[in-house]
Amino acid sequence: MPPKKGLSILIPCYNCLCVELVKGLVTQCEDIEGLRYEVIVADDGSTDKHLCLLNEELLDLEHVRYITREKNIGRACIRNFLVQQASCEWVLFVDSDMNIIREDYILSYIQLDSTFLVAYGGYEVGNENTTNLRYLYEKDAAPKHTMEQRKLHPYHHLHTANLMMKRTTALTYPFDERFKRYGFEDVLLGKRLQEHDVCIAQINNPLLFDHFETNDSYMEKTEEALQTLCTFRNELSGFSSLLTLNYHLRRWRLHYLILFIFQQKRRKWRTILCGENPNLKLYMIYKLGYFISLF
């Protein structure tokens, strides 16, 4: 029996080589008899022209569209653009730096009960590197992101790295295009879906995350994400533990002490976190201090 779902796999790409990922997805789709599918890769104004050239191999693959944009429009806009380009009933967002680890990855989504309009499969962390801050953070957070934990608060655990939605749902609840900088566009999506009682399935269908940026780059991303959180703190209320902690610290007037210490230690802490022996506890303290300093 042909699959009931037609699937558009949507991959936003920025300075990332994703040819092998796309080939793996195409292979799985081809193995599902009768599946109508397409893979759309949208390069969002990448600055690494060598990687862009390598990704042009995608132009030779059947069922694959490779779209390049001259200017970067941001994480929310590029995903909305991909949804508009899609032609199938269901869309699957996959980040370009993820890897496939399950032979039935696509099939698991195709066979999912269609009463769910959104499904998130999670991700696993690989490539152990204890000198890498992003690895340390992701590995420490992994127990909180198991399927069992995600099911306790399904709307709080949505990440665009591995997210399937009915296309009409994605069009009805698009990503907020005010989010131009890094972070939290998927968190706000989860909140909107909760507000409208959209059915979400939290399933065990992970991709592998094993490509980590340098400590310097991750610190820049962290600060950018905290700026986003500060800007949209009203919209994200109730969906960020850092916002909740900040609220209580200000209520108790303790934020002045944290801010004073942060201002004295900021440069030294950042040097440590960008070095070869980053400390995860120090990272969490830095995040709190940096966030408080934004007000």
Residue ranges and their predicted role:
Residues N15-E30:
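Short, well-formed alpha-helical segments that are part of the catalytic scaffolds
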Residues V91:
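Short aromatic/hydrophobic "clamp" motif used to bind/position activated sugar donors
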Residues T146-M165:
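A recurrent flexible, glycine/aromatic-enriched loop bordering the glycosyltransferase active site
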Residues E224, S241-F295:
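Non-catalytic, C-terminal membrane-associated alpha-helical segments of glycosyltransferases
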Residues D43-C52, M98-N99:
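A conserved acidic beta->alpha catalytic loop
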Residues R181-L189:
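Acidic donor-binding loop at a coil-to-helix junction in glycosyltransferase catalytic cores
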Residues E103-R134:
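Conserved donor NDP-sugar-binding/catalytic core segment of glycosyltransferases
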